[in-house]
Structures are given as C-alpha cells and as structure tokens.
Amino acid sequence: MAVHAVVVDVMLKPEILDPQGSAVSNALPSLGFEPARSLRIGKHVELELEAEDEQAALAQAERMAETLLANPVIEDYSVRLA
C-alpha cells in the first residue's frame, strides 16, 4: 500500500447563515481593509491515507467526510488529491 495525500474542503451550504464569516467581514473595514463583497469561512482538511491506489484513498476520504468531517445537512464538501 502507498500513502496518498488527500484534501477535503468543507463549506456551509450557500443558504446557511455564516456568522463567523459575517463577523470577519464586518471587522475588515475597522482594520483598514476594503469591505469584502462576500466572505464565508470553511474548513480545509489535509489527510495522508494508506490505500491501494488513488481511487481507494479518495473513496476513504469521501466516507470520512460523509460521516465525520462534514455535516451533510448544512455543509457541502469536496474531496481531491493534494
């Protein structure tokens, strides 16, 4: 088995309010930055997985995202090789 680097990105679904993103967006002007038109906060997870091949590593990361890394009711996620 080989080690494969995989990335899982998790974001709130567009229709879900993002209070953390709103707080950061509102703070930008007070720090001297131009306001952002849109700002949303998510998670970026980097994994090194032992698997037979890249497809098996992606499938394993997909299962991890579905069951633990993301809440599919309110979050979307993507899985890719690093």
Task: Identify the meaning behind each predicted range.
Residues 1-82:
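Long, contiguous binding/interaction regions
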